[in-house]
Amino acid sequence: MREVQDEASPGGDATRDGHADEGTSAENAAAEGAARTDAAGTTGLIVGADGRTRPLWAASDPLLREYYDTEWGMPVRDEQGLFERLSLEAFQSGLSWVTVLRKRPAFRVAFAGFDPEVVAAFGAADVERLLADASIIRNRMKIEATLQNAKATLALRDEGGLASLIWSFQPAQTPRPEHARDVPSSSPESIALAKTLRSKGFRFVGPVTAFALMEAVGVVDTHLLGSHRRGSSGVWS
């Protein structure tokens, strides 16, 4: 998932950067050129045409830019929202995050809006249906893990719920990275979270995936200090 840290991108895999849609506009091409120029700089940040400062990965594709500006790092505290993000982080493993974002609408249809009660009731026929659905990422292990994770999510309700568990691993302090290379790919808290999730029956979640989840839902803030989104979650000052 984040085995190779790439410009502090969500999930951080090496394929995340440089996968723009076909027909990239002149504006995006210019932004990418600026990104390449800035790559030798000291921050790993670029200033977009709108005057806002972002990390390189968030400037490489319009969909990533929108995701960065509106979603990534904002607090998610509801069960369904967290189950969706945990599921998508697992599906992203080995792939680029922009691929997941492009397929997210189809994922939501295929997995009933990531309602854990519905997904937990999926059976063998549903697995075959999902494997035949070209609009999503067709990987049997990831699909079966998602079904198991839905069941584990329901079981957690007797212990306070998925949101309570994930947010209980919020650290006392969040990273304050000045450059993309300063962003960690895991932490003591993500190691502990992954271990706890696995003990509760969750699959396809390790320390790196757990940290990417924590970043995505605001448990930690790894926005670079010079980014226009730093501190936007309201969780960290």
Residue ranges of model-derived segments:
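HhH-family (HhH-GPD) DNA N-glycosylase catalytic core used in base-excision repair
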Residues: 1-28, 32-237
